[in-house]
């Protein structure tokens, strides 16, 4: 495989890419004019569609897709069918808030199942998410919100580490002070009364039907933005795209981590 990837990189990566669903097949695998390179030209797809719907259509609706182990030891399993249902519900809610293709959504949440739903639902409708580590403070969060030109913030109110609660709400509230963006709160500590432009995560999830469908986007359409730590200056946003990330990540998981269907 390694030799094949060197001798015929376009044939090699094209074969891996064709394992996925393409709403519109790509016409060319790679266009490389230094320093720019573009993958799967002309193709349209959606990474979340391929992660969920494609597997449901393959007969894996009742197979466990996500296993979540909480801080308190609680375990929760979601099948592909259950996960798709929740993603569609949340995606419907996000669309009703005016979030759509190309919009940036910053996610400032603890390591929870709901955080995964937020990422999947955002990408499902062609929006671009940027996860900010819940250990970062006010200035770091605000800087990333501004740089990404976020339209929406999805934030947790509290995070738990080694059994102790860490207040996220006050950090998030200070970070968005005077900024014109909507906020969805994942509330665990207590259910606060929310002002205009602020919404409850669970109400957005369970208060909407699973009617959203995947937004098919260009292979080079941004999937998410991942910021560097900013230890040597302003944080730099690394952009990953639907086509390349979907194909590259699958290849690495199957080849180097030996992940199999079962």
Give the predicted meaning of each segment:
Residues 1-78, 82-85, 89-92, 176-178, ...:
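N-lobe entry segment of adenylate-forming
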Residues 110-111, 140, 154, 221, ...:
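Hydrophobic, small-residue-rich alpha-helical packing segments that form membrane-like cores
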Residues 119, 136-177, 248-262:
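Conserved ATP-dependent adenylate/AMP-binding module captured primarily in the ANL superfamily
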Residues 126:
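Structured binding elements
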Residues 48, 62, 66-120, 137-142, ...:
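Conserved AMP-binding/adenylate-forming core of the ANL superfamily
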Residues 105, 122, 222, 228-231, ...:
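Conserved S/T- and glycine-rich ATP-binding loop of Class I adenylate-forming
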Residues 62-64, 184-186, 196-227, 234, ...:
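Conserved pre-ATP/AMP-binding loop-to-beta segment of ANL
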Residues 72, 155-219:
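ANL superfamily adenylate-forming
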């Amino acid at each position: 495989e390694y030799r094949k990837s060197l001798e015929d990189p376009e044939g090699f990566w094209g074969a891996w890419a064709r394992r996925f669903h393409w709403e519109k097949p790509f016409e060319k695998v790679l266009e490389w004019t230094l320093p720019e390179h573009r993958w799967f030209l002309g193709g349209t797809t959606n990474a979340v569609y391929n992660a969920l719907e494609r597997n449901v259509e393959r007969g894996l609706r009742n197979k466990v897709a996500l296993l979540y182990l909480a801080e308190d030891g609680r375990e929760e399993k979601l099948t592909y069918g259950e996960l798709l249902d929740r993603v569609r519900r949340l995606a419907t809610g996000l669309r009703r808030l005016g979030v759509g293709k190309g919009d940036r959504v910053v996610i400032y949440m603890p390591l929870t199942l709901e955080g995964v739903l937020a990422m999947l639902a955002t990408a499902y409708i062609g929006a671009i998410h940027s996860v900010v580590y819940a250990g970062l403070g006010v200035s770091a969060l605000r800087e990333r919100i501004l740089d990404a030109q976020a339209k929406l913030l999805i934030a947790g109110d509290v995070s738990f580490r080694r059994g102790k609660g860490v207040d996220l709400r006050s950090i998030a509230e200070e970070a968005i002070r005077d900024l014109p963006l909507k906020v969805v709160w994942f509330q665990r500590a207590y259910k606060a009364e929310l002002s205009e432009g602020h919404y409850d995560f669970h109400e957005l999830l369970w208060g909407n039907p699973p009617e959203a469908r995947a937004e098919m986007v260009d292979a080079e359409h941004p999937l998410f933005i991942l910021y560097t730590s900013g230890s040597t200056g302003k944080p730099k946003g690394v952009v990953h795209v639907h086509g390349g990330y979907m194909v590259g990540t699958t290849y690495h998981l199957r080849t180097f981590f030996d992940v199999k269907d079962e």
